């Protein structure tokens, strides 16, 4: 008669880990508890497609007078990060709502929660479309309960460095092509994009640029996308996250900010670099603790993306610094390649 086995210390540890992962995936037993940041139940995606419910649990929808206008990222039980340009001074705080845990915007889900705003804190350096400081802190009216579908993303510390070429993911509910809205039931869209250095991005944005409308990617910005175009952000969903994976956790590397047209060649998406504002964020919300990002790889030169045009200086041009087409209600995920292939 065989004896029942007794678990040793190593086996007990393995069981504990499996139980913990099971709680995260099921959403039971962990609700109301402090959730670790940057944990998502799904693997990283490639290309552009509809997300799975709960795949990006920090993604929020921001509405004004009941209409979706921007995205945002949950960073704690009561705070969301978005873009400053989503909150014009003439708009009233009371007319905004934040929808958390949503997947299909046009469908009801008991997993989604809606909150009004207690406070909106735009960065003081934000002046106009395309300027520095395109970031805003939003305080929910009351703390939200975490679940499988509602979880925070990690905030990177000020010294965080994300290497060129790192494949990150931008998410949103915006247009899938210029002037083409996302079809009902409007599932959350996701697109994998590689990071591009600021110098190369500046070079790309000044290829065939109009002299009267200079472009300048500033130090508090980061670029991501494809030189050949076709897959990019488009109008409808600024403020949403550019999420980057490092050693199993997702970090809020960028906040969708501005761009020139949708999916145009030599015009990658431009994002507010969240780590540039780590100190400001902590000065406003002391309980928000930015996380040190492990340096797993060095940035590789990407000047070849701009070819012979790289002689462009990274110094700002004189005059008004604004893109040819800035989309005032934000940028949304424009999965142009799949759409173009069907038309």
Swiss-Prot record:
Signal sequence annotation: 1-29
Family classification: Belongs to the peptidase S1 family.
S-S bridge residues: 37-154, 70-86, 168-244, 201-223, 234-262
Its biological purpose: Possesses a trypsin-like cleavage specificity with a preference for poly-basic substrates. Stimulates epithelial sodium channel (ENaC) activity through activating cleavage of the gamma subunits (SCNN1G).
Maturation propeptide residues: 30-32, 323-343
Active site positions, chain numbering: 85 (charge relay system), 134 (charge relay system), 238 (charge relay system)
Subunit structure, interactors included: Heterodimer of two chains, light and heavy, held by a disulfide bond.
Sugar-modified residues: 159
Tissue: Found in prostate, liver, salivary gland, kidney, lung, pancreas, colon, bronchus and renal proximal tubular cells. In the prostate gland it may be synthesized in epithelial cells, secreted into the ducts, and excreted into the seminal fluid.
GO cellular component: extracellular exosome; extracellular region; extracellular space; plasma membrane
Protein name (record): Prostasin
GO molecular-function terms, A-Z: serine-type endopeptidase activity; serine-type peptidase activity
Alphabetical list of InterPro entries matching this protein: Peptidase_S1_PA (IPR009003), Peptidase_S1_PA_chymotrypsin (IPR043504), Peptidase_S1A (IPR001314), Trypsin_dom (IPR001254), TRYPSIN_HIS (IPR018114), TRYPSIN_SER (IPR033116)
SUPFAM superfamilies named in the record: Trypsin-like serine proteases (SSF50494)
Transmembrane feature ranges: 320-340
Key words of the record: Cell membrane, Disulfide bond, Glycoprotein, Hydrolase, Membrane, Protease, Secreted, Serine protease, Signal, Transmembrane, Transmembrane helix, Zymogen
Pfam families: Trypsin
Peptidase S1 domain residues: 45-286
GO biological process: positive regulation of sodium ion transport; proteolysis
Enzyme Commission number(s) of this protein: 3.4.21.-
């Amino acid at each position: 008669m065989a004896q029942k086995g007794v678990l040793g210390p190593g086996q007990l540890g393995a069981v504990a880990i499996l139980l913990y992962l099971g709680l995260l995936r099921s959403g039971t037993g962990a609700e109301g508890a402090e959730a670790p940041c940057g944990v998502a139940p799904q693997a990283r995606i490639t290309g552009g497609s509809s997300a799975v419910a709960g795949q990006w649990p920090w993604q929020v929808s921001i509405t004004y007078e009941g209409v979706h206008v921007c995205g945002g990222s949950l960073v704690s039980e009561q705070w969301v990060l978005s873009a400053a340009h989503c909150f014009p001074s003439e708009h009233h705080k009371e007319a905004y709502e934040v929808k958390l845990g949503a997947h299909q915007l046009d469908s009801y889900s008991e997993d989604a929660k809606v909150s009004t705003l207690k406070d909106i804190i735009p960065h003081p350096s934000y002046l106009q479309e395309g300027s520095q400081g395109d970031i805003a802190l939003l305080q929910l009216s009351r703390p939200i309960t975490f679940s499988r579908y509602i979880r925070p993303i990690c905030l990177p510390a000020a010294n965080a460095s994300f290497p060129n070429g790192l494949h990150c993911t931008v998410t949103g509910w915006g247009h899938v092509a210029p002037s083409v809205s996302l079809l009902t039931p409007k599932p959350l869209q996701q697109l994998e994009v590689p990071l591009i250095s600021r110098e190369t991005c500046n070079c790309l944005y000044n290829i065939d640029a109009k002299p009267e409308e200079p472009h300048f990617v500033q130090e508090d910005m980061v670029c991501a996308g494809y030189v050949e175009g076709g897959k990019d952000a488009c109008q409808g969903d600024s403020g949403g996250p550019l999420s980057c994976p490092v050693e199993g956790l997702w970090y809020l590397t960028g906040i969708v900010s501005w761009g020139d047209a949708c999916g145009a060649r030599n015009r990658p998406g431009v994002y507010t670099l969240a780590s540039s504002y780590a100190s400001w964020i902590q000065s406003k919300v002391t309980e928000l603790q930015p996380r040190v990002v492990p340096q797993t790889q060095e940035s590789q030169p990407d000047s070849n993306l701009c070819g012979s045009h790289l002689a462009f200086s990274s110094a700002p041009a004189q005059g008004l610094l604004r893109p040819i087409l800035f989309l005032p209600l934000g940028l949304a995920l424009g999965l142009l390649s799949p759409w173009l292939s069907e038309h």
